[in-house]
Amino acid sequence: MTPRSIRMAGFIAGFFVVVFWAAPGATTSATLVPHRGIYSIGLERAEAGSGVVGVEGAMIYKFTEGCDGWTVENQTLMRFDYEEGRSLDSSWSYVSWESKDGLRYRFRVNQTRNGKPGEMFRGTATTPGDGGAGQAHFSQPSRFEVTLPPGTVFPTRHLLALIEAGRSGGLNFNRFMFDGTSPDNPYEVNAVITPLRGAVSGQAAKGPLPEFQLHIQYRDDGIAEALLQDYGDITLKLHLSKVEALSRPEC
């Protein structure tokens, strides 16, 4: 089994999300708190055939706000321990900037494995603002373009819309989202929202299986307190161990 990347506000793959929301029924508009969070990473579960016996690591997630956009920085370090004593060190970094009007997006992704360069993606994306199709331009690892389906949004606006759905009592949320973390973008994200941990119905089993399932426990200010990433053969757990509020700009 190869190492997986932990991605927040840089979600991957046409996947299924279960959101545990702290404050359904709120009437004010969703806002995100600029912050820097440190998450511990560990192995929640591993099937016998996965070959994985242990995972440990940390993720540093930084969300900042400017007058015209948001910046997300994610740096993840993980060590995978395998049967027969093998191990692998993996690092993954992601930096993005997204305009508040939802029209422009820049991204940069780097991965290393045992210190050797791995995947690298860089590029920009735009949407027309009228709900029509957008366009993504990758400059690395090679130059190519991807058409974004009508209604595609970028990560921060996707998170804001997800929070709005949770606060208004919505139970299901489905939308295309582009984050630039792989050439397979954009991804169709299917979310089920519940105010109670563990109160998940059997809906996840219907239809095509997603690449993985992501369970997120959010605070009312949009900060994730705990996450589970279930890839089928292994499940990784993340817990918020430290959070620091950051200032907002005076615009």
Stretches found by the model and what they are:
Residues 1-6:
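N-terminal secretory signal peptides that target proteins for export/translocation
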Residues 74-126:
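Hydrophobic/aromatic-rich structural module bridging two neighboring secondary-structure elements via a short loop
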Residues 31-40, 68-73, 102-108, 188-191, ...:
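Short, hydrophobic/aromatic-rich segments at coil-to-beta transitions
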Residues 25-87:
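N-terminal cleavable signal peptides for secretion/export
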Residues 62-66, 97-99, 126, 217-219:
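Short beta-strand micro-motifs enriched in acidic
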Residues 10-21:
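Bacterial N-terminal signal peptides
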Residues 108-251:
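Mature, soluble, non-transmembrane domains
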